[in-house]
Swiss-Prot record:
Disulfide bonds: none annotated. This is Protein RecA. Keywords: ATP-binding, Cytoplasm, DNA damage, DNA recombination, DNA repair, DNA-binding, Nucleotide-binding, SOS response. One of its GO terms (biological process) is DNA repair. The lineage of its organism: Bacteria, Bacillati, Bacillota, Clostridia, Eubacteriales. GO terms for molecular function: ATP binding; ATP hydrolysis activity; ATP-dependent DNA damage sensor activity; damaged DNA binding; single-stranded DNA binding.
Length: 356
């Protein structure tokens, strides 16, 4: 590249000096001088999704939108991210606009509910003001808004049932995101907006599905995750979980349109062992011969459920396989065996009490 004229360089330096004097250090910089541009991430608690996102999780200092049909696992994924943030010593805020947060389920996923900051706002304006105040404090690592559809504007709540409020929620979201975007970036906080799907009337071609709250969130979000339940997981006659597929429909920090598939088990969340088996087979680290799964000389079991059970009972083998997968994708390695989930601990405690 040709060198810039020395007089131009001096003029730029003077202008940058004046800007920094007026607006503070770091308000303007040369991209090459900024060492902070390496994007940090917080894991989603799902190995396949971390790989699909390209940076090992959801990016810090960015807005993330998780959307999909009802009961597809949107809140579960958000709570897993909250649990991972808390494991790293981070603080998490949860704006429960739907008034539907289940603390015992959150505990089962590994969330420290004692230190989870929860707000159940009366209006959309109140919820977004609380979110902004928490982000502005600089002490919050993850803020979750569940959900955009439940952020009802004050005028709609105070009005009559049949009143028309066209575009009111879209304007509210647009204004809130304009205020939030800069603060989120400066404080390195992750803002996760959970959103619902609606159908556009009279669409002949293309998908009729759209998300609530206007277009602003689509523009401001660095990552958008489309969550779908694709199958039920059966054990005997009962259904014990869902098979879930996530498509990364927008990604500003890595290549988009990658997909992840995993199990969400009822009362347990994302199955870490199932994920390790699936990704291990895909990466040819775990060998599948007929119905048998094996890792090197170790036979994991006949059938996927038995292989999952073996990894649950032998966490050091699961850790070894996971770290090999992480190494292959340049993701940070796990340095210790994952602690037992709250559900497993509760199960053991109940068993001990019944034995007594």
């Amino acid at each position: 590249m040709a060198n810039i004229d020395i007089n131009k360089l001096k003029a730029i330096e003077n202008a940058m000096g004046q800007i920094e004097k007026q607006f503070g250090k770091g308000s303007v910089m040369k991209l090459g001088e900024n060492s902070v541009l390496n994007i940090d991430a917080i894991s989603t608690g799902c190995l396949d999704l971390d790989i699909a996102l390209g940076i090992g999780g959801v990016p810090k200092g960015r807005i993330v939108e998780i959307y999909g049909p009802e009961s597809s696992g949107k809140t579960t994924i958000a709570l897993h991210i909250a649990a991972e943030a808390q494991k790293k010593g981070g603080a998490v805020g949860f704006i429960d606009a739907e008034h539907a947060l289940d603390p015992s389920y959150a505990r089962n996923l590994g969330v420290d509910t004692e230190n989870l900051i929860v707000s159940q706002p009366d209006t959309g304006e109140q919820g977004l003001e609380i979110a902004e105040a928490l982000v502005r404090s600089g002490a919050i690592d993850v803020i979750i808004v569940d959900s955009v559809a439940a952020l009802v504007p004050k005028a709609e709540i105070e009005g009559e049932m049949g009143d028309s409020h066209i575009g009111l929620q879209a304007r509210l979201m647009s204004q809130a995101l304009r205020k939030l975007a800069g603060t989120i970036s400066k404080t390195n906080c992750i803002a996760i907006f959970i959103n619902q799907l609606r159908e556009k009337v009279g669409v002949m071609f293309g998908s009729p599905e759209t998300t609530t709250g206007g277009r602003a969130l689509k523009f401001y979000a660095s990552v958008r995750l489309d969550v779908r339940r694709i199958d039920s997981i059966k054990q005997g006659d009962g259904i014990v979980g869902n098979r879930t597929r996530i498509k990364v429909t927008k990604n500003k920090v890595a290549p988009p349109f990658k997909q992840a598939e995993f199990d969400i088990m009822y009362n347990e969340g994302i199955s870490r062992q199932g994920n390790i088996v699936d990704v291990g087979v895909k990466e040819e680290i775990v060998q599948k011969s007929g119905a048998w799964f094996s890792y090197g000389d170790i036979r994991l079991g006949q059938g996927r459920e038995n292989a999952k059970q073996y990894l649950k009972e032998n966490p050091e083998v699961a850790l070894d396989i996971e770290n090999q997968i992480r190494e292959k994708h340049n993701l940070p390695l796990m340095d210790a065996v994952i602690k037992e989930t709250a559900q497993e601990v509760n199960g053991k405690e109940n068993k001990e009490q019944s034995d007594k």
